[in-house]
Structures are given as C-alpha cells and as structure tokens.
Amino acid sequence: MRCTRAIRQTARTGWLTWLAILAVTAPMTSPAWADDPPATVYRYDSRPPEDVFQNGFTAWGNNDNVLEHLTGRSCQVGSSNSAFVSTSSSRRYTEVYLEHRMQEAVEAERAGRGTGHFIGYIYEIRADNNFYGAASSYFEYVDTYGDNAGRILAGALATYQSEYLAHRRIPPENIRTVTRVYHNGITGETTTTEYPNLRYVSQQTRANTNPYTSRRSTASIVGTLVRMAPVTGACMARQAESPEAMAAWSERTGEAMVLVYYESIAYSF
C-alpha cells in the first residue's frame, strides 16, 4: 500500500516525533488492544434514555467492512450503511467528545446562532461477544488483504484506538446506565445526573477476544482521516471538521492531536 503525504499535519510537533517512535516500535510491543477485552464500554449520544432504554442502538445498515467504518466512509457523512455501532472502552475519551459538543453549543450562542443550552448523554454498556476491538479487527483486515507497509501506521493507530464495534445492534438489556449532562446557556451552570436502566440484565460478559473478520472493500480509492487523539474513531466522532477546527478542539481539551491522512492510495482495498 503506497501513500503520499502520509502525515499531512500535526496539531503539536512533539506528537509527530512520538508517533514516529511508536511506528517503529509498534510491531515489537504489546498494543492496548492485546489486553483483556473490556466488560464495559461507553457511547456518547444525543438521544434521551426514553428512546435508548426502550430501543437500544441499531446500526445504519449492513456494510460490515471494518476499514470503511473506521475511515468514516460508511458512516453519517458517507454512505450511512455501516453495520457497526461505535462504542469506546475509555470513558474519558467519550467525555472529551461530549465536552467538545457542549463547547460548540456555547460558542454558537456567543456568535448569535443558538441559546447555548446543551444536553448530551453518555451510556454505560455491558460488552458481550458481539463487541469487537476496532484495532484488532483493523490488523486482521491488513493481514488478510493488505501488505506489510500498512502495518506501521496500523500499529500506531492501535496504540490510541479504544473503539469497540457492536455488530448490528446493542439491545436495551446491555445498557446499564446513562449520564445526562445539561449545560444552561443562561447561567453557565453544568449539571450531571445518572439514571439506571430498569431493563438492564446483569451478566458476567466481555467483548469478543477475536477480531471481526471483514469482507474486502470494493473502493479503489479511500481518502482517510484518522484522529489519533483524543477521539476514538471516525464513526465515533465527527468526520467533517477542518484541521484548524480539530486543532482548536485539541487546545480546548488539553490534549494533543495528530492528524494522519492516507491519500492517493494506489492499492485497491
């Protein structure tokens, strides 16, 4: 797989050096996804528990290509046919994304485009055998269809990746609690409230230890924007932001962000 301008821009220069070290050492180290699969995962969503506790989460479609999901191609700004529901094993990553959306509401109000009010939800979910590690599934895809050149950046991605893919659906019985975050645009006060899901079924389960075995993508050219930090994946977070907006988000959250572009990919996935 040949990529031109593989690393286009970094939000902070220090992360580029760290990424280069990581890319060299990744094949020799044990990445995060090699740990025990999580028993609990998290998802940010704008839908209230009145809906989610009743219906759970359902994927957009039946496209189970892992690469197209991780690059956002099958997500909302793409074809909207992904067969996966994105979750994260890191609550903090999910909180950072919620904070970003809340900050957007505040800035819109300052610009005269809204009230500044914001309501967002973080759902705590019991993972089971239907949840697959995004990074390990990506490695499986590279091993099956790609070549060794793709493993270097995949190793760097795996170190940051905290996304777990639920295939097709997350039933209400897997959703343990929801944390409601409300920001009052008038007073500036933010309140957080947790609610249990009365339909939740308590079991001792974990995410699948195996990667998801994906079909091969038919796309001949894939333009990929991978956010290395602090977000979890293209379908988990927003895909259409400019590098400037993403760098500004990085400054607000106190996190460094590395933007990696895979462009002009000659290899047909």
From Swiss-Prot:
What name is this protein filed under?
Pertussis toxin subunit 1 homolog
Instruction: List GO terms (cellular component aspect).
Output: extracellular region
Please state the span of the N-terminal signal peptide per the UniProt entry.
Answer: 1-34
Q: Name one GO molecular function term.
A: NAD+ poly-ADP-ribosyltransferase activity
List each coiled-coil range: none
Keyword annotations for this protein, in alphabetical order, are: Signal
> SUPFAM superfamilies annotated for this entry?
ADP-ribosylation (SSF56399)
Which gene name belongs to this protein?
ptxA
Q: Which organism is it from?
A: Bordetella parapertussis (strain 12822 / ATCC BAA-587 / NCTC 13253)
Q: Which domain of life is it from?
A: Bacteria
Instruction: Describe the family membership recorded for this protein in Swiss-Prot or TrEMBL.
Output: Belongs to the bacterial exotoxin subunit A family.
Q: Which Pfam families does the annotation name?
A: Pertussis_S1
